[in-house]
């Protein structure tokens, strides 16, 4: 297991209690036997980059699963739904960590990171489904999917009687 994967795995034990913060980052580095300096080399912004890498790894896993289970006979909307459900199922494995990540990403200073994360996920989904559009549709597909994904995540991670 790489240092990056080890830090993510260890931090997931602490995030539900402490959130994605300096304390979690320091505890993860200490438990992994990595100095804070080495940790900062891997994640220059500390817990923020650790959180974004955690999300990115789940996004990459979702793309692998979607590509491997691709059913070209389905309509695009069904394939998009499958991709979204796959991503939500992956988030379910660490729901509280995802909830804490979304809380952090909703802060004003995190808007650029949040926008990039949502855009990259939308782009990855459309690319994994073989989107070949080159006109304005390229943008509208990604913006629309990003909006749907963001709304779905907010609903999914919000506290409710279902929990």
Residues covered by each model-derived region:
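Domain-scale activation on soluble regions of proteins
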Residues: 2, 100, 104-117
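Short, amphipathic alpha-helix enriched in basic
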Residues: 2-37, 45-52
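Hydrophobic core segments within long, regular secondary-structure runs in both alpha-
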Residues: 8, 48, 81-88, 119-126
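Short, basic, alpha-helical segments at the C-terminal edge of helix-turn-helix-like DNA-binding modules
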Residues: 55-61
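Hydrophobic alpha-helical connector segments
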Residues: 65-100
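Amphipathic alpha-helical packing segments from all-alpha helical-bundle domains
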Residues: 109-131, 141-150
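Conserved small/polar residues in nucleotide/adenosyl-binding loops
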Residues: 156-163
């Amino acid at each position: 297991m790489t240092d990056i994967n080890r830090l993510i795995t260890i931090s997931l034990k602490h995030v539900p209690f402490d959130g994605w913060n300096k304390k979690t980052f320091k505890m993860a580095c200490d438990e992994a036997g990595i100095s804070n300096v080495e940790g900062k080399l891997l994640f220059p912004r500390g817990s923020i980059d650790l959180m974004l890498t955690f999300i990115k790894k789940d996004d990459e896993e979702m793309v692998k699963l979607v590509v491997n289970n691709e059913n070209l006979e389905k309509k695009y909307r069904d394939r998009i739904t499958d991709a979204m459900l796959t991503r939500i199922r992956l988030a379910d494995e660490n729901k509280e960590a995802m909830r804490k990540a979304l809380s952090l990403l909703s802060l004003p200073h995190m808007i650029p990171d949040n926008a990039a994360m949502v855009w990259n996920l939308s782009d990855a989904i459309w690319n994994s489904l073989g989107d070949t559009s080159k006109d304005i549709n390229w943008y509208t597909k990604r913006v629309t999917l990003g909006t749907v994904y963001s709304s779905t995540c907010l609903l999914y991670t919000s506290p409710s009687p279902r929990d």
